[in-house]
Amino acid sequence: MASSLKKLISSFLLVLYSTTIIVASSESRCRRFTSIISFGDSIADTGNILHLSDVNHLPQTAFFPYGESFFHPPSGRASDGRLIIDFIAEFLGLPYVPPYFGSQNVSFEQGINFAVYGATALDRAYFVAKGIESDFTNVSLGVQLDIFKQILPNLCASSSRDCREMLGDSLILMGEIGGNDFFYPSSEGKSINETKLQDLIIKAISSAIVDLIALGGKTFLVPGGFPAGCSAACLTQYQNATEEDYDPLTGCIPRLNELGEHDNEQLKTELKRLQKLYPDVNIIYADYHNSLYRFYQEPAKYGFKNKPLAACCGVGGKYNFTIGKECGYEGVSYCQNPSEYVNWDGYHLTEAAYQKMAEGILNGPYATPAFDWSCLGSGTVDT
């Protein structure tokens, strides 16, 4: 009897211990971030594309009305104002993260942003080998990471603090990245194995995280993709779809959103695997999909117009979007109240949408695990 009781108690303690470990590993630990290091594409690009472009062939984001709600002279951001990364910086009390390209004095204190408009998760060689040669940037996620590794010794040499410690105190924003990997083949009408491509994208993101952990990275915010089936650009591309293809509530195309959600689930699975391998690291998934999708479901609740699919800046068609006549081109108009719009230019969102998304990620249900801000002396986010 005593032996059976002893076994029962031992089993109970083992279950209790295992449960404790699982709970602990699913919670983020509070950290006072001293900088933001960013990788990705146009969703986080704070101006790199401007400095990488030929002065005679500047991108649309170099022209008015980009930046008209906040920065005024266009900063290269693909919006009328601030991006999610900007609202994160504001909340943390940090400077807006400057673009790496074109910066004179790069430092951990300022933060560093390698994200580039049009960037892909996979290297350019992958697409060229498949006959996809769109006019897109060569600064893939791998290239961005290589540049960071090259400049890291110089960054650390300018400070008395340990290099690993400085990176450990940084919030590393890994994306969003991967959407362009699907967009470029689609825009050229190329057939691709979507499952295989998504596997390669996730592998590239995972590999980058592991490399940064080896360098001292401790906290990663890894966003999933947007609901592409609600994008004005995608809706215009699929405008010949039948009525049954659309969600009667939102007007989005569920099939496209479901594909994106499947990809996001795969990414989350990989992040959970990494979290188990590196229990001392915080890997936080940012649910960009659902953080944005709620605006299409209940636009008025969040302060948007009742028809949230149309672009604020654009011309023509049901969604105020025409390929070849996008925002920033001569003769293309923009709305006078961008804060009431979700979509800015057909591809990207307004500052108002990005702000509400940032709030939902920093202090809402759209980060897994949720951020712990207890060491900041505040339990709520005010962006």
From Swiss-Prot:
Listed GO CC annotations: extracellular region
Residues listed as glycosylation sites in the UniProt record: 105, 138, 193, 240, 320
Stretch forming the signal peptide: 1-24
InterPro entries to which the protein is assigned, alphabetical: GDSL (IPR001087), SGNH_hydro_sf (IPR036514), SGNH_plant_lipase-like (IPR035669)
Biological process (GO), any one: lipid catabolic process
E.C. numbers: 3.1.1.-
Domain of life of the native organism: Eukaryota
Keyword terms, alphabetized: Glycoprotein, Hydrolase, Lipid degradation, Lipid metabolism, Secreted, Signal
Subcellular location, record wording: Secreted
Active site feature: 42, 345, 348
Enzyme class of the recorded protein, top EC level: hydrolase
Stored CDD domains: SGNH_plant_lipase_like
Recorded GO MF terms: hydrolase activity, acting on ester bonds
Family, similarity comment: Belongs to the 'GDSL' lipolytic enzyme family.
PANTHER family, A to Z: GENOME ASSEMBLY, CHROMOSOME: A07, ZINC FINGER FYVE DOMAIN CONTAINING PROTEIN
Designated name of the protein: GDSL esterase/lipase At1g28660
